[in-house]
């Protein structure tokens, strides 16, 4: 996974990538640390690029996307939010949404 360091980088992704996953985390978040490797393993099964952001380092992204809890997983497709989960990630549901997106491509 690649790190997003600023809001402009995120905007560029929206413009250039058809489909991608964004994982938002915060420092000292034990759930974030536990879920991160699971997200990495899951996304390897698909050909979607994946990015992560430390929500404290990019406050503009946090505000623009209403990312007020962590962890958060958002799937983007065609420049729009397709699916979002926050705090408690339902990996079965996330997998279903990734499958759904993989057939759309």
Roles of regions detected by a PLM:
Residues 65-74:
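Structural micro-motif
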Residues 4, 24, 43, 47-60:
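Thiol-based oxidoreductase modules, predominantly thioredoxin-like and allied folds used
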Residues 1-20, 97-99, 103-105:
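N-terminal leader/targeting and pre-domain segments
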Residues 77-105:
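Non-catalytic, surface beta->alpha helical segment in thiol-disulfide oxidoreductase systems
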Residues 20-22, 50, 73:
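Hydrophobic beta-strand anchors of alpha/beta hydrolase catalytic cores
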Residues 6-10, 57-62, 93:
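Short acidic active-site motifs
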Residues 9-41:
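Local sequence-structure signature of Cys/Sec-based thiol-disulfide redox active-site neighborhoods
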Residues 12-13, 61-64, 82, 97:
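CheY-like receiver
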